[in-house]
Amino acid sequence: MIFLLTLAGLKVLSIVILFGIIYLFASSIYNLYFHPLSRFPGPFLARAQDFWVSRQWISGNWPWEVEALHAKYGDIVRIGPNELSCAHPQSIKDIYGQPNINHPQFFRKFTTFYKQTDVGGSIGTEVDPHIHQGIRKRLAPGFSVSALSKQSDIVIRHIDSLLHQVSRNGQCQSGMNMSQWFMWLAFDVIVDLSFGEELGTVETGTGNDWINMLANSGFQIALGYVVRRRWKALQDLVRYCLVNEKSKSMRTKYIANAREKARQRLERGADVERFDFFSHLLREKAPEANIDFFASQGTTLVAAGTETTSTFMSALTYYLLQNPRALDRLQEELRRSFKHHSEIDGESTKSLKYLNAAIEEGMRIFAPAPFGLPRVSPGAMVSGEWIPKGSIIATAAHVTSRDERWFFKSKEFHPERWLPLDHPHYDHIFSKDRKDASKPFSIGSRSCIGIHLSYMEVRICVSKLAWSFDWEQVSAHEDFVKDARLLGLWKAAPFHVRYQPYPGAEPPVMNHSKINSDLA
């Protein structure tokens, strides 16, 4: 009897495997020769099935592999059966530039990429353009120019805490792992502005469960996207089998912690000394002033504001150290402009031409979000090609902004290309550069809401460090760019820098405030 049951089971299994093989073969033939996107070039595995995207997305090498594809196949490459990657400046405007969400040519977000769960969306994950528009409208006052002026002191306080640590530890033989310190800094800033609370990660020089979750969740994020693409119906089972108990526990604690921080922020109400992202909602007694909204938006803002800003500051530090002339010019501008580090703030750094050029060049050569932001075509022209309705398409930011056709010496770091024509360091060899090929924060109605905050934070931090210290890379073997991996977001490699105090530059005097280290 058992023998017969075993035979029956094997027979069923054989039939399932056979049908699976037939399905793969038949669908591959369709995708290769009859699919609406079959005319676009790309690797065989990418055109036939989703295997290429899945493999590259979890390998960490996505930006470099996509760059190689465009070098081989051209502006528009088929990276999946129903997915295209574009590396032309015009595609940025065509895909992301339509401001009217009701316009027939509006490209909607690709749900599978953005929506990780069935829970309500946030400013970063909501796919319905009307709901997203409402969320953005309610959050916008917290990111306005007026709000930034009130938030500047908060940002400076955390940056001064970093300077204090650098003045104490920067001269040691091993230097400081700035990938780690920049992440702690960005985390402290964004948590303070999201939940009105100082965690003091930089001040104590130690991480916590929350930031460790952010730093180590990249593979799970990448794997989650791959699973949703291919096995959406079985995603819970696959997640159960592949995600370990520690990761599940960290995620549960992360969500619980965010809700607790949201509850505490609600309890403090609008009568707080500092201005954060949710202050206006509390003052208005808005319906959005609730735990669900604060926790959902706050966790997205913390994740996005920590990873992208910190990794970019590490990359910019790396490129400046690799290009001593650029670092010298930056320091000369800063030390000529300021007599004391306390003069350096968000407003005073806006007019510094070389500083802002260096930041723009860093954004170009090492985009904070290098993956394409996938959209669903409504049936429209993109870069002169008709993209059928329902097709997935994105501009490959990392590729487009590093293309030799759009930027002279595109793989090299040259802030001079962003300088005004009358600047003494401007070089006419960059006069034909297409600046519109570099849009690190995207454009249109769904561009990054925190763009001005990010620029302000980077301006102040880089300025204070470059004004106060002379920099030295500790190890020539550390290649920050080569060693970086993309897993959901950039996973920064360790990068050690030694800092020597500049003569006459005094470190900031810290007023140690009460630090809340209870991470629920």
From Swiss-Prot:
InterPro entries: Cyt_P450, Cyt_P450_CS, Cyt_P450_E_grp-I, Cyt_P450_sf, Cytochrome_P450_monoxygenase
Chief localisation class: membrane
UniProt key word Oxidoreductase: yes
Transmembrane domains' residue ranges: 2-22
SUPFAM superfamilies: Cytochrome P450 (SSF48264)
EC class: oxidoreductase
E.C. number: 1.-.-.-
Record: residues binding heme: C448
GO molecular function list: heme binding; iron ion binding; monooxygenase activity; oxidoreductase activity, acting on paired donors, with incorporation or reduction of molecular oxygen
Pfam families found in the cross-reference section: p450
Compartment list: Membrane
Family: Belongs to the cytochrome P450 family.
Protein name: Cytochrome P450 monooxygenase btcC
Organism listed in the record: Colletotrichum orbiculare (strain 104-T / ATCC 96160 / CBS 514.97 / LARS 414 / MAFF 240422)
